Regions:
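N-terminal, polar/charged subdomain of small-to-medium soluble alpha/beta proteins
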Residues: 2, 7-97, 113-140
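A charged helix-plus-loop insertion that forms the helical arch/lid used to bind
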Residues: 96-110
Length: 140
């Protein structure tokens, strides 16, 4: 959590990938081809509106190269897919001491509900495929 941020809100870390997959107990639980690996952190004050705004922003984000090599295309433009993985450590507060606290993270039941809601929203916005990790699992 960056110091000085006034309000905590749903966060996503995006990694452009040519292919990604996540496994639980040696079995693949989700995968995607060219597109994004999305690590999603859900905070206590988050709601469906936050998930809607973030999903729409990600779907329209122009970070893929066009024919001239300029980052000018969205995941929709390149026919990409996404893999969404819950990542509560994005909600960590590192400001005091050397041990992070997670007091701002949403309770597991709420976080799981919003993670599923966000994933479903991405399925609507990104028709070429959305894979998922398993909420709360030790993912590999």
């Amino acid at each position: 959590m960056p110091a000085g941020r006034a309000e905590k809100e749903m966060q996503a870390v995006l990694q452009r990938v040519s292919r990604a997959e996540v496994s639980v107990n040696g079995r693949v639980s989700g995968s995607c081809n060219r597109g994004f690996l999305i690590l999603l952190g859900v905070f206590e004050g988050d709601g469906e509106e936050d998930a809607d705004l973030l999903a729409e922003k990600i779907a329209k984000l122009r970070v893929f190269a066009d024919e001239q090599g300029k980052m000018n295309k969205s995941i929709l433009d390149v026919g990409g897919s996404v893999l969404v993985v819950s990542q509560f450590t994005l909600c960590a507060n590192y400001v005091h001491g050397n041990r992070p606290d997670f007091f701002s993270a949403a309770e597991p039941e709420k976080a799981n509900r919003l993670y599923e809601y966000f994933s479903e929203r991405m399925r609507i916005l990104v028709p070429n495929g959305v894979g998922n990790g398993v909420f709360g699992a030790d993912l590999q």
